[in-house]
Every structure is written in structure tokens, then in C-alpha cells.
Design a protein with these regions (language model features):
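N-terminal exported-region signature
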Residues: 1-190
Length: 190
């Protein structure tokens, strides 16, 4: 017996995507917008292990040359920004699902955040959930300050794959994308 069209709702038709992370020799500020099945640093970074020197966020680090018990970064995620140091220019491909959106807890002051989106949006719209608490958001080359006239802001579109420093005046929740959207990716809450 053939099923009806309503039976199709039980299936998940999302497909995986491949994120390409371009890394230059030295330190890079990056983020991931895909979630692989296994987000352990050793697994995700396996293709570049010979060139990887270290990856770290604000609280943890992973160095492939160290014994496993000295590495405190045990899982990567789409919410954090990461400093990645490589010995030479290399490209990393990460295959996984793109979340529909994410809710991230931010603390008063500077936060190292990821950008879990497959396409870029204007900072003014992406930061709307934080209201007037946003002081500045910046990556290595561009910045956005809501108190400045638009022509002084060099960050006009947030770029997938980059990490960002976000400064806020109080603790809050930053909602990126549509966390209630269904069928187009995983919903990520922190």
C-alpha cells in the first residue's frame, strides 16, 4: 500500500552541506556553521592535522601534539568563535547539517562567538535580539558599532565561517536565525 502525502512529514529531507574553512599560516578567527555527526576536534580537524598547531576558544584548547588528557577542548560547536593556528595555508572541509538558528548566552563585556548561518546578514538585523545592549561586534578586519553613523561601520554583512568578538553591556541571549523554524536544520539552544 502506498502512503499518502501526509506520511511524508515523518521523513527528514534535509541534506548535508560542506563548509570550506580557508586558513592562512598563523592565527585565524573562525567559526563553524555546520554540525558534523562527530564534533570532536580530532575528528573535525583530521584532514589538516599535519598543519594544525592549536585551536582554542575562551576557555579550552586542543593541540594535536599533546596527549589527549592535556587537551581541554573536547567538542566544537556552531556557537563559539575559535582561534585556529596552522603552520601553512590550508583549506578545511567540514560536512554536516546547518542549524535553522541558535540561541547563545552572552555575558556582559566581550564574547567570542560563532556565526551559525550559511549566508550572511546585516549586523543590525542579526543583533536585533540583543536590543540596545550591543556596543560593538568585530572580526579581524571589520567592525560594527550601532552608535556610529552607518558610513563609519566597515562590517556591513556578517560572514559565515568567521568568528566574532561581540561586546554587550549586560548578560543576554543572542538569537541568530529562526530557532523555531523546522525542516531546514537543527535548532540549537545553549
Amino acid at each position: 500500500k502506498l502512503g499518502s502525502a501526509t506520511d511524508l512529514a515523518a521523513f527528514d529531507f534535509r541534506s548535508t552541506v560542506v563548509q570550506e574553512v580557508s586558513l592562512k599560516a598563523g592565527w585565524n578567527l573562525v567559526s563553524f556553521y555546520v554540525e558534523a555527526d562527530d564534533m570532536a576536534p580530532a575528528t573535525v580537524l583530521e584532514p589538516i592535522k599535519d598543519k594544525l598547531e592549536q585551536i582554542k576558544n575562551l576557555t579550552s584548547s586542543y593541540d594535536p601534539s599533546l596527549p589527549f588528557f592535556l587537551n581541554t577542548l573536547t567538542s566544537l560547536n556552531v556557537k563559539d568563535g575559535y582561534w585556529v593556528k596552522v603552520s601553512e595555508t590550508v583549506s578545511l572541509e567540514v560536512e554536516g547539517m546547518v542549524p535553522a538558528g541558535a540561541s547563545m548566552t552572552v555575558k556582559k563585556g566581550w564574547n567570542l562567538v560563532g556565526y551559525p548561518r550559511e549566508s550572511g546578514e546585516a549586523p543590525v538585523s542579526e543583533l536585533a535580539s540583543l536590543g540596545s545592549t550591543v556596543v560593538q561586534i568585530k572580526n579581524l578586519t571589520k567592525s560594527y558599532d550601532p552608535a556610529l553613523p552607518g558610513f563609519l561601520n566597515t562590517l556591513t554583512t556578517m560572514e559565515p565561517g568567521l568568528g566574532y568578538w561581540l561586546k554587550v553591556t549586560e548578560n543576554g541571549t543572542w538569537t541568530v536565525g529562526d530557532v523555531s523554524e523546522s525542516g531546514s536544520g537543527r535548532d540549537i539552544a545553549k
